[in-house]
């Protein structure tokens, strides 16, 4: 077999391609040199744009009244007229005494709320205490009933044992004798 030439994809033999590529590149270079471009055109600005560029436009400044921004709540001095957009609940106080009376009323109301909360807490605590006492009383009652039942059972046993004490002692001795004589080993099959 004849030796195969290694084939490389994307590359062709250098001898043939080098001759072909040179004339193309040289021709393109020549054409670029020969072709003359026209000089770039200057963009002229229009007269009206020049005047507008030179002028500085004055921006309009709005007053606070025109903007209609809401004012912050402040203490209004005596004699000041109420603003137009006054809220319903807003109260303007003319004198110091009136303001202090309103403040005292509000404080008293708040203290009343606090006092009522404390009273409710006390009442709830009393209710809890009463419930706990009732539960303890029920528990003690149950214990007493249980103790009484135990005592009655013990008394019944004592009555039975006192009447039959002689006969039981004879029977128990005879049973123990018979058990000792007749002890047998028992085997159970599972």
From Swiss-Prot:
Provide a Gene Ontology MF annotation, just one.
mRNA binding
Keyword Membrane attached: no
- Coiled coil spans: 109-165
Q: Where is the composition biased (Basic and acidic residues)?
A: 39-49, 129-151
The record, for InterPro entries, names: Loc1
GO CC, sorted alphabetically, is: nucleolus; preribosome, large subunit precursor
Where composition is biased (Low complexity), the residues are: 1-29
For biological process, the GO terms are: intracellular mRNA localization; mRNA transport; ribosomal large subunit biogenesis
- What does the UniProt entry say about where the protein is found? Nucleus, Nucleolus
Q: Does the keyword Transferase apply?
A: no
Q: Region (Disordered) spans which residues?
A: 1-70, 129-190
Basic residues bias: start-end ranges: 181-190
Arranged from A to Z, the UniProt key words for this protein are:
Coiled coil, mRNA transport, Nucleus, Ribosome biogenesis, Transport
What family is this protein classified in?
Belongs to the LOC1 family.
PANTHER family noted in UniProt: 60S RIBOSOMAL SUBUNIT ASSEMBLY/EXPORT PROTEIN LOC1 (PTHR28028), 60S RIBOSOMAL SUBUNIT ASSEMBLY_EXPORT PROTEIN LOC1 (PTHR28028:SF1)
Subunit text: Component of the 66S pre-ribosomal particle.
The record describes the protein's role as: Required for efficient assembly and nuclear export of the 60S ribosomal subunit.
Q: What is this protein called?
A: 60S ribosomal subunit assembly/export protein loc1
Organism, as annotated: Neosartorya fischeri (strain ATCC 1020 / DSM 3700 / CBS 544.65 / FGSC A1164 / JCM 1740 / NRRL 181 / WB 181) (Aspergillus fischerianus)
Q: What is the lineage of its organism?
A: Eukaryota, Fungi, Dikarya, Ascomycota, Pezizomycotina
